[in-house]
Structures are given as C-alpha cells and as structure tokens.
UniProtKB/Swiss-Prot annotation:
Localization annotation: Secreted
EC number of the protein: 4.6.1.-
Bilayer-crossing regions: none
Protein name per Swiss-Prot or TrEMBL: Dermonecrotic toxin LdSicTox-alphaIB1bi
Annotated coiled-coil segments of the chain: none
Broad class of the protein's primary localization: secreted
Keywords: Cytolysis, Dermonecrotic toxin, Disulfide bond, Glycoprotein, Hemolysis, Lipid degradation, Lipid metabolism, Lyase, Magnesium, Metal-binding, Secreted, Toxin
GO molecular function terms noted in the UniProt entry: lyase activity; metal ion binding; phosphoric diester hydrolase activity; toxin activity
Annotated catalytic residues: 5, 41 (nucleophile)
GO biological process terms, semicolon-separated: killing of cells of another organism; lipid catabolic process
Amino acid sequence: LDMGHMVNAIAQIDEFVNLGANSIETDVSFDDSANPEYTYHGVPCDCGGTCTKWEYFNEFLKGLRKATTPGDSKYHEKLVLVVFDLKTSSLYDNQASDAGKKLAKSLLQNYWNNGNNGGRAYIVLSIPNLAHYKLITGFKETLTSEGHPELMDKVGYDFSGNDEIGDVAKTYKKAGVTGHVWQSDGITNCLLRGLDRVRKAVANRDSSNGYINKVYYWTVDKRATTRDALDAGVDGIMTNYPDVIADVLNESAYKAKFRIASYDDNPWETFKN
C-alpha cells in the first residue's frame, strides 16, 4: 500500500490518490465526551506535511463515502483502505469503550450508510495506547447491537505506539482479536528511525504462530528510506509524497517483487511468496 499521510480535508483525498496513493491515513480527534469530533492533526507538525487542514469528522466520512462508492462522481477505484489514526490520548482510559461505540455509530451512519450501499474501503482502527483496547470491543458491540456485525469484515486494527511486539499480542488477546491485524512502526519523518522493530514485526507476520497479518512503516518521504523499508519486507509505506513511493515501486529491482494493491487483494491475509 502507498499510504497518504495526514489526509484530513475532503479535497486532499483526490490530491493524494491522484499522486498514486491507494490508501490514506486520517487523524481523528475526540471531544471531552469521547465523541469523534474533527479530522485534524494539529501542531507539532511533521516536516513537509500540512497539519492544519480539518473537517468535522462526520462530514469527512460523507466525503470519504463518495470517494469509495462505485458509481459516485467522486469515486476512486484505487482507494481501497483507510487508516483512522485515533487521537485517544486526550481521553481517560475508562472512556476508550465509549469512544469505540461513538466511532462505530458515526461510521455506520455516515460512511456505511446504515449498511445500504455505503463506502467500500477497508478501515483500520489505529490506537496509540494499549490501555485503550476496549475501544475495539465497544466498536464491535455497537455494530452488532445496531444489526450490522457483517461490517466487522471490513475492519482491522493497529496499535501505533511502537510497543514491544509481545505486549501488543497480549493486548489483542484481551480484546478478543484473532485476525485483521496491521502492525505499524515508525516515527515522524523529521527524525530517523532504524528498521529493527519493523524486522521483528515482519518476522512475526511470517512465522506460523504470529499475530500480525500486515506491517506498515511511517512516515517515509525519501527514496532511499523507501527502498530500505521495501527491502525489509513491509506491506505498506505511509508518506507525504505518494508519488515518491510510486516511483520506487516502478524501479526494476522492486517491480518484480511488489505491486500496488487493488480492491481484490485481501488486507487481512498475510501475503505468501
């Protein structure tokens, strides 16, 4: 996946997909009552990114729905997966379940159109804090109680805090999650980060008893770092410049081994060579 970073305004969806992104990452901030409120990153900003664009969350979802509904004038066939970077650090730990419930209601209504020909993209709920794992259970309970448990087929998970792989595995056990797991690793593009933990995550993904289905690395804006990440075997790279990632994927060394994922690829299935 060529993942566009900090896509928080509806107009940016077109912009990033047109540059080659087949996936976007969107920041979600919450109010004091754990309602998802804005798609907004805010300062401090990464280097080279635009961090002050925003929409109301529900309005962004409507724009995203149009971009991922076949037949809509705004439809992009290429856009197959959306990562919601859930900014739950503003919440108390005991609000995580509520945040999940409210997030599910927002998505059900504004993105999935109450189960009636809504947006088709796969969704990854990315949570920064292992202590907030009940966001997942709250989300699942709500879709089930609202009569749409089948939509969980479209939902995956990520803990984005660069925690020990073993601790993440334990947390998924607590949350009752047995699949659909993406593992992110990374740091703001202003700083350098080695690939040690990425290699551990890839090893877990490729082992017979690992919990990880896919690994993505963030935030990469340089060709050299892109090559290093691909050499380490990642499934996705998050970037402010999707055209840079697309260019590297077109280099002869990578063309033979990697291709841009399409909607027919299963994002919850580990790719076997």
